């Protein structure tokens, strides 16, 4: 059974700016993968301990999809999306 997926404002802002159709399709596929199995990806440590990051490739570049989850209500919050460069620094802000 799939989990319910919610988007944060940060994620929506980045998603709206995507212009390449293949990147949008790859992002949608990554979101579906996370919704079907939230344990995919890796859990971060330290300051970002509640964050799960799923890595995927699009057009030869590595992208990261950051999410948090509520296990009791089976809800996933999409927190951030972007290339690896400065991804974690921007999330800490």
Language-model segments: which ranges?
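A short, surface-exposed loop/turn module that caps and links secondary-structure elements
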Residues: 32-58
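Arg/Lys-rich, positively charged N-terminal/basic patches that mediate binding to nucleic acids
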Residues: 1-30
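Residue-level recognition of oxygen-bearing side chains
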Residues: 10, 39, 86
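Enriched for short, Lys/Arg-rich terminal
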Residues: 4, 58-64, 68-93
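Conserved catalytic core of Hanks-type protein kinase domains
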Residues: 17, 33-34, 81
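Hydrophobic alpha-helical segments
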Residues: 24-27, 38, 63
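Alpha-helical interaction segments
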Residues: 1-6, 41-46, 53, 77-78
């Amino acid at each position: 059974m799939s989990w319910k997926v919610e988007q944060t404002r940060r994620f929506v802002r980045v998603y709206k700016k995507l212009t390449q159709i293949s990147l949008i399709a790859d992002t949608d596929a990554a979101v579906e993968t996370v919704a079907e199995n939230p344990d995919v990806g890796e859990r971060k440590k330290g300051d970002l301990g509640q964050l799960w990051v799923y890595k995927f490739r699009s057009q030869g570049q590595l992208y990261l999809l950051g999410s948090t989850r509520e296990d009791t209500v089976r809800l996933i919050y999409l927190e951030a999306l972007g290339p690896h460069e400065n991804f974690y620094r921007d999330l800490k802000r």
